[in-house]
Amino acid sequence: CWGALLLVCAALPALAQSNARGDAGLCVGGAPNAPIKIEVFSDFQCPACRTFYLETIRPVLADYASANKVCVVYREFPLRNHQHSRKAARYATAARRVGVWQWVQVTDRLYLDQSRWSQDGTVEATVARALSKEDLKRVEALLGDSAINAEIERDLALGRRQGVRSTPTFFITAQGKTERVTGIVQYSILRRYLDSRLGQ
């Protein structure tokens, strides 16, 4: 595994745990058939999730997913003790249905401005700063679709089945093996791991 550098690392069988892993519609970076797949369960109001996304996942998207070496799947896992995280998850889910780029813009802004909207609940205004007027209208039109909440519930149920108890938790599948990791992993550490699995 990754030794003491990680909070938790449990080897799992390489499962279908992600039929979703092969679903292009859920891949927010990289190709569905990339040699490595990272599935992240995250909460927009979680400070550790903010750090992990901005300092680790964003570089992974830029350096690995853009070259189709890694497929990144993001799962919404809003925690009950976070008052506004469910609303943020709904906006992000709707944005992904509009397009991956819109999802990235919304996710970036929600995490960058987390301290503000977590306090005052201004999720809508935060999302509005991330999107063009046209894209914002498309996202808002989707919010009333029951499928948005249903998708979040599926993510929550999937996470619970896979042993997710806190955020961020992510799963890496490479070379036929899946590992579960809980907590923040620095990009420099994750990069070494990815390179070792890619034979670089």
Where does each model-flagged region fall?
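C-terminal cap of thioredoxin/glutaredoxin-like
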Residues: F41, V127-Q200
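A short beta-strand-turn-helix
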Residues: N19-K37, Y64
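Loop/turn elements at helix/coil->beta-strand transitions in domains of secreted/extracellular proteins
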Residues: A34-K37, A67-C71, G99-Q105, E134-L136, ...
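Structural alpha/beta surface segment adjacent to cysteine/selenocysteine redox centers
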Residues: S42-R129, Q200
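Conserved S/T- and glycine-rich ATP-binding loop of Class I adenylate-forming
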Residues: I38, C46, F170
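Bacterial Sec-dependent signal peptides at the C-terminal "C-region" and cleavage site
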Residues: A11-R21
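Processing junctions and N-termini across compartments
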Residues: A10, V40-D43
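Bacterial N-terminal signal peptides
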Residues: C1-P13
